[in-house]
Amino acid sequence: MTDYTTDIAVIGAGPVGIFTVFQAGMLKMQCCVIDALTEVGGQCTALYPEKPIYDIPGYPIVSGKELIDNLKKQSEPFNPQYLLGQIAEKIEDYSDYFLIRTSKGIVIQSKVIVIAAGAGAFGPNRPPIDNILDYENKSVFYQVKNISDFHNKNIMIAGGGDSAADWAVELSKIASQLYIVHRRRNFRCAPNTALQIDNLSQNGKINVIVPYQIKKLLGEEGKLHSVVVQNITNHEEITLQVDYLFPFFGTSANLGSMLNWGIEIKGYQMTVDFETCRTSRDRIYAVGDIATYPGKVKLILTGFSEAAMACHHIYHIVYPNSPLNFQYSTSKGIPNKN
């Protein structure tokens, strides 16, 4: 039994996946989008919704959330079907269409598959702290969705990479107290950010707790009131008053079942024809960070271009008897609005 029938099944609801919906729609092709996360936006939503992005054409500066909101709005006229919180587990090839089965048991019939999965399905690396699950999504978070929610709060950030350092700088602007806890004395971040942390520490805006690690969370009913940290050298323990904890230890990602789809993969990227973005398997395309070819530049704008190239090639599969007459959007407008 088929739950959905579509022209293109897009795997991945990040910026490139959403833009694929728009490009397909401009060519009168319908899309169904599958993503492991419960919200669209990929890493832009999950990891840096409020961090600035500077290299999107036409935007001197744009946040991850704003970019995703605008991409969704741009694609809305084409009525995409989003299947979130699930992964594409299995595909069956029936010569002129695929059946795609998701981890929730949903079956999609699609003429073509476009993989826009970035680095694959991913999630945060959870630190090995007892009872951390009791606090997750209440006072322990792995991303900052709305910075204003943490105004005048006592915040602890754990980690020493770019995400930890960047958010320490940003949240120090609105926090009552900001602690950053790291096992090492040096941060593995951009030199300019490390300098900012040093200056903010000297001015009392950030409390740098090194070389320490989190030992225990204290609170009740999911609400933190303090965190115990331990010195990794002399094992001294300190209890700090904390309202919210952000463990930033990176994310882990994998291609999962896609490794078994008969697609040529090199270093967790799919080799594609750079003119069409077709993979080694007919009617399966890859765009964005997951796609690789000689000279590939891993930028969001590169993925946008790849989405356009792939959709123009896919058109001939979806409409084999209808020639594609290229038109600029200024000439033809938005198909479903005319």
UniProtKB/Swiss-Prot annotation:
Reaction(s) catalysed (UniProt annotation): 2 reduced [2Fe-2S]-[ferredoxin] + NADP(+) + H(+) = 2 oxidized [2Fe-2S]-[ferredoxin] + NADPH
SUPFAM superfamilies tied to this protein: FAD/NAD(P)-binding domain
Pfam families for the chain: Pyr_redox_2
UniProt binding sites for FAD: D35, Q43, Y48, A88, F122, D289, T330
Keyword rRNA-binding: no
Enzyme class at the top of the EC tree: oxidoreductase
Cofactor(s) required, per the database record: FAD
GO molecular function: ferredoxin-NADP+ reductase activity; flavin adenine dinucleotide binding; NADP binding
Keywords of this entry: FAD, Flavoprotein, NADP, Oxidoreductase
Co-factor binding details: Binds 1 FAD per subunit.
UniProt-listed Enzyme Commission number(s): 1.18.1.2
UniProt family annotation: Belongs to the ferredoxin--NADP reductase type 2 family.
Subunit structure: Homodimer.
Protein name from the UniProt record: Ferredoxin--NADP reductase
Higher taxonomy: Bacteria, Pseudomonadati, Pseudomonadota, Alphaproteobacteria, Rickettsiales
